[in-house]
A protein has these predicted regions:
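Extended catalytic/binding region for NAD+/ADP-ribose chemistry, centered on the ART fold
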Residues: 18-50
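Active-site and NAD+-binding cores of ADP-ribose-processing enzymes
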Residues: 1-17, 48-176
Length: 176
């Protein structure tokens, strides 16, 4: 996409679980709590649980960065007791298929309307880790600083090897 790790999507692309909404559109930035969940939510998003393969076109132009949060962020919790407080089950919000994104985006819009900086939930594809979405009109790029000591560029041999080691037990082949 050509964006920096802390640069927001201004509303381009297909609808996602929690974006897009607003007029004008609220820019969003998705993030993950760990490298594995970042890969699971992006590169492996459409790979069946039974396994599959990633082709070079799927990963060679992808990079991963790490962000450091530089201020307290108020996040709507779409997990645990946060779901209970909302009176909704994960199956109806964070675990839905894409055909229900029209519904799930409304929850994100409501969190935005209530003044939250973003939302947090358990990753659907790596449910031991948290996933995040930040609202670009509330959290600036300066609030999420790129860690200069970390990067993965999946065009580099060492990072392709890391990706391969991660994916082999998941029955996902990395085609080169």
């Amino acid at each position: 996409s050509g964006r920096l790790a802390n640069e927001y999507n201004p509303g381009k692309g297909r609808q996602t679980r929690f974006a897009f909404f607003g007029d004008p559109v609220v820019p969003v930035l998705y993030a993950a709590g760990a490298e594995e969940s970042a890969v699971a939510e992006t590169l492996l998003h459409d790979v069946p649980l039974s396994g599959g393969a990633l082709r070079p076109d799927d990963y060679l132009d992808k990079v991963m960065g790490r962000l450091t949060v530089h201020r307290h962020l108020r996040l709507a919790s779409f997990m645990g007791t946060g779901l209970r407080a909302l009176g909704v089950d994960a199956a109806d919000l964070t675990m839905t298929e894409s055909d229900r994104y029209v519904e799930t985006v409304r929850w994100s819009a409501a969190a935005h309307e209530d003044g939250f900086d973003g939302i947090v939930w358990m990753s659907r594809r790596c449910n031991t880790e948290r996933a995040y979405m930040f609202f670009g009109d509330r959290v600036g790029s300066a609030d999420l600083v790129i860690d200069p000591d970390f990067a993965r560029a999946f065009a580099l041999p060492d990072d392709i090897d890391w990706l391969t080691r991660m994916c082999v037990p998941l029955r996902v082949a990395i085609r080169r």
